[in-house]
Amino acid sequence: EKDILVVFPSLNWGTTKFIEEHKFLDKVFKNVIQQYQIPQTKFIIGGLSGGGMVSMRYAERANENIKNTYIKPKAVFAIDSPLDFSHLYQQSERDIERNFSEAAVNESKWLIDRYNSEFGGSPKDVPLEYVKNSIYSQSEKDGGNAKFLSKTPIIIYTEPAIQWQMKNRQRDLYDLNCTDISAMINLLQIRGNKEAELVVTHNKGIRPNGTKHPHSWSIMDSDKMLNWILEKLK
């Protein structure tokens, strides 16, 4: 109806550096272009959480050097994606120390082990590795890799739901993805990206089973997102 082809690649956790994920996406893009004769300049990519992380790093690598990727995304979107791996590591340490939510503790232990293995240590041990691989780095004046999004249309949805976080995870604003998301979008706007947008929602996070959770697809307004995509594809 809108003359848009939607592709849902099945991406499971591969590497924190997203090397294998990006290789897989390159194959997907190549097949789609060959099968449907879609111009390489007409792709918009994005996703929830990890899917958004993979998409934003793909766009950054494409903008850094077009030889890095098969396509250069025309725009990118994300829903409540973590951006700064150093921040995420530190937040995971706090979740383990609090020992309040079993789900949060288990995920945090998994993440710390993974980062220590792939990066060669903690952010204190190898800070440059974290800057090198993060979508955004709060420690860097230019935002680290975020500088490669300075000319790319980007929209990120996030729902802080601070009361829910305090009650269900004992987390505060320092622990949430919204801090880095707002910081990165603000930086991009300051650097002249007039198409960098932040959407903060309230009470929209609902899982398919009806459970309230702010880290959910439902915080994205599908109709507005479709209109945004159509506008960027012009």
Task: Enumerate the predicted regions with their spans.
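Mobile cap/lid helix-loop segments that gate and shape the active-site cleft of serine hydrolases
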Residues: Q91-K147
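Conserved alpha/beta-hydrolase
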Residues: K2-T16
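Alpha/beta-hydrolase active-site loop
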Residues: K17-Q37, M53, R57
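Acidic catalytic loop of the alpha/beta-hydrolase fold
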Residues: A161-M166, Q170-Y174
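Primarily recognizes the serine-hydrolase "nucleophile elbow" in alpha/beta-hydrolase
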Residues: Q35, T41-N99
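Short beta-to-alpha linker loops that shape the active-site pocket of alpha/beta-hydrolase fold enzymes
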Residues: S10-G14, P82, K204
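C-terminal catalytic histidine-bearing segment of alpha/beta-hydrolase fold enzymes
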Residues: I154-Q163, T179-K234
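Phosphate/oxyanion-binding active-site loops and adjacent basic polyanion-contact surfaces
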Residues: K17-L25, G50, L176-D180, W217-S222
